[in-house]
């Protein structure tokens, strides 16, 4: 689940990812991953449309966590982290980033980065970096940007 901060919290990017798994012997949910301050987005009921984060289960059992800015400024983007359960931990298996510049139609790009293998495709070109296993608790978006060959 995605958890918004308390209403008086002024942090810009303080939406957390918390994943619970059902206990095998009881009807209880156990915390499997806690990653506070991982997702950027609007959290207020009267927040800005186009900045809402989301989380959903995928058919293969992975989770997709999406954040976006499709509302303000010329730089519009959507980012999806694909989380997979590996060796009793939730890791970032994939990173997808789509960017567009509203004032420069040729200034956009998209990138799909398989974090586990290090293979990426950006703008139709194949890229390769070293594969990594990164728990969601340790993930920083800069890792995805580097894998996509984007300099910060």
Q: For each predicted feature, which ranges?
A:
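A domain-level signal for the mature, folded cores of soluble proteins
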Residues: 2-5, 11, 44-49
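Short, surface-exposed coil-to-beta transition loops
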Residues: 12-15, 50-51, 75-80
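Acidic, small-residue rich beta-repeat scaffolds with periodic aromatic anchors
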Residues: 55-152
């Amino acid at each position: 689940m995605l958890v918004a901060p308390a209403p008086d919290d002024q942090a810009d990017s303080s939406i957390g990812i918390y994943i619970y798994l059902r206990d095998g012997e009881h009807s209880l949910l156990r915390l499997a991953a806690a990653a506070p301050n991982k997702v950027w987005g609007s959290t207020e009921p009267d927040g800005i449309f186009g900045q809402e984060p989301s989380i959903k289960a995928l058919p293969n059992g992975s989770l997709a966590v999406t954040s976006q800015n499709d509302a303000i400024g010329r730089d519009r983007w959507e980012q999806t982290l694909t989380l997979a359960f590996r060796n009793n931990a939730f890791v970032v298996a994939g990173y997808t980033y789509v960017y567009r510049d509203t004032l420069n139609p040729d200034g956009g790009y998209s990138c799909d980065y398989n974090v586990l293998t290090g293979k990426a495709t950006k703008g139709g070109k194949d890229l390769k970096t070293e594969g990594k296993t990164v728990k969601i608790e340790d993930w920083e978006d800069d890792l995805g940007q580097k894998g996509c060959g984007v300099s910060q």
